Amino acid sequence: MYAQVAVENVNCTFDKDYDYSIPQQLEGKALVGCRVAVPFGVGNRKRIGIITRLTDSTQGKRIKSISAVLDEAPLLSYEMMSLARWISEQTFCTYYEAVKAMLPAGINHKIIRSFCAVPGVDESIVASLDSDEKQVYDYLLSRSGYVKPENFLKTLGFDVSSDIPERLLKAGLLAANDDAVRNIGDNNIRMVRLCEGSDDVSMTKKQSEVVNVLKDVGSVSVKELCYFTGYTPSVISALEKKGVVECFEREELRSFVSRYAVQSAYDSGEIHLTDEQQKAYDGLLEDYKSGTGKTALLYGVTGSGKTSVYLKLIDAVLADNKTVIVMVPEISLTPQTLSVFHSRYNDGVAVFHSALSAGERADEWKRVKNGDAKIVIGTRSAVFAPLENIGLIIIDEEQEHTYKSEQTPRYNAKSVARYRAAWHKGLTLLAAATPSVDSFAAAKSGKYSFYELKNRYGKAVLPQVVTVDMRNEQQTENRELSHELIEELNKNRTDGKQSIVLINRRGYNTFVSCTACGEVVTCPNCSISMTYHAANGRLMCHYCGYSVRFTQKCPSCHKPALRYAGFGTQRIEDELEKAVPGARIMRMDTDTASSRFAHEECLNAFAKGDYDILVGTQMVAKGLNFENVTLAAVDSVDQQLYNDDFRSLERTFSLLTQVVGRSGRGEHPGKAIIQTLTPENEIIRLAAKQDYDAFYDTEIRMRRLMIYPPFCDICVVGFSGADEVKTRVASQRTLDKIKELTAGKYKNEKLIVLGPLPARVPRVNKKYRYRLIIKCRNTKGFRSMISEILKDFYGDSKFSDVSVYADMNPEITV
């Protein structure tokens, strides 16, 4: 019997299924969807792979054998194996990279190599070693068994990345052993139970009491048994030696309980819909019942009650014994969403997002795979939840860019959702107050079903929106907080109401410059200005993480003339404390919400009224529902509005609409303030009116004229290398290859190629970056051409130190 195996850590040139024989002792264990350890390459170093197919014969010669099967049962179903193949073809990644994206990090394996000395080696070989090699060899000779290199290298004072062990291995002085090790172990509990036929064994009084407890409870953890009886584990050990009891391990899944989830108005009761909501629900239910794998768009203004429609639809899906995935774009939305679903569906809900530890993520994944949870809630990775019989996938705030992965594999969760829903003949539901232009166009064309909620739920009305011209404010030295905003914030606090203020920049000041020579302090690794963070007194790069303590000495002219400029969330927090005396202010950005449960803690405290003002970045703008918030403000949108990405207008309109929508969601009317240097801008004017339809009409005309999605697809081919000239030459070579192929066998592929050009931030982490932007159609022929180009590039040794990737329809093209 033979297995075809997709192996990890290969580039696209070598991405294929490799044949391995299955040893007799592993037959019946080596199944499709199981991971295996296999020898790979000339040196036969072990690598992790996954079995994609079993066969009775092979055309290969000198077939190697599988070393070990790493899973007791297949991790991936036939559907997920097919999905991995589809992702690898769509996103230009390897098959195993697609597989790895589907699995939680906590169940991943890695190969750990250890070494031992080979005794009795020819003395002349030992004599030829240099002093460092001799020191390592002698040390390992003195040790028994295999030792991990990081252990003995550190002990001997060498860098743990030293190649000394590999040199000694090549010389035949060391032997190596490769083991596949789980990243995170199972959470096992030591249990105890009675053995059969042990009644006649003589026991002490303590031992008899322990046995009597076990007769009542059956099996129990050692820890609990000691607690109940008041005895130490030594009593249990003595009984185990006598054969009266046996101890065993039981896995206990680490359950994620949202301890800080905000209170929810939803419970298990009947959901009552308005006529408008009922109409949308009826249509969506019909789409779901059709069993044809449809996609629908639910377009509803902020506060229109989309969640009520979701829940009623989910009730219908669960009644059919089917499962549900609910995706949200930001971790900050997960606590509120989770509280809604937990209050209604209890432990039938699992959660996938990065605030969980690796062990918790692994256990939630197991809980879903075991069938213990029928609903999965989470961010982008939740789309890979190992659910069977999926009836509904909801993508909330579907316009958000976070549904697109910026790392390999560069998948779009919306596309994966449509694939999975079609496979299970379920429904994909996209929902938003400001749908993406692409999705709205698909709905307009009839590709998606379309439903609309035009009114806010209950008595709530859309807030009054005021646009403040900051050019006038700056003349009076009010640089960031206008008179009107300060007045409204104070009034809101006096009235016992809450406010949300958004500023889309982290840190205290957005850059630091020298007043003597004009130099802006930039990151030494990246071509980007550094941001001052007052909390730790450091300048930080938000791209590579480099930081340095702030001093006033200019690194260019060396004069003590460095000054802050620009405003970040930390600075606005300080300004608000001065402008609204006595206000309780909470700042929420990736700096303050980076710890586990930080989002829950922040949102729960704000929901309970512990704070008057919530100030933060985009994470405070979307999907949050606080009935006591009657004022929402945007500090400045001009930086986002006037950048060079073709989606900048769409993103700005969406952000403004979302922020405005946080206000007045309860019984009290709301107000929103937009501060801008260009109040006459059409996008700002339309966002103030919450007029998405007019925005769409304007935007779609521009996209048609300029040939941007949805009137084409865009593929970005990116290059990165430490040598700028070589990186630029690599991008030009690829352009020449595209011209060659489109003049020949791919002549039917119609393209518009822009570049090569430096990326918007041309240097990150000491590497220069170039881009080719290709306007195309995402056809099988085009993807085949790009795959051929990538394989050709990786096969050219001249560019071995330049990395390349292709990204289809990225959210950010520059």
For each of these PLM feature ranges, what is it?
Residues 1-432, 444-460, 780-787, 791-809, ...:
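Accessory, non-ATPase domains that flank or precede helicase/AAA+ motor cores in DNA-metabolism machines
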Residues 2, 30-32, 347, 726-740:
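A short, contiguous, amphipathic alpha-helix enriched in charged residues
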Residues 175, 586, 741-759, 800-808:
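Short beta-strand elements
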Residues 63, 762-775, 808-814:
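Short, low-order "capping/linker" segments at domain edges
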Residues 264-274, 278, 282, 292-728, ...:
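Inter-lobe coupling/hinge segments of SF2-like helicase ATPases
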Residues 733-745, 785-796:
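Generic non-transmembrane alpha-helical segments
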Residues 16-18, 221, 713-715, 768-770:
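Short amphipathic alpha-helical segments
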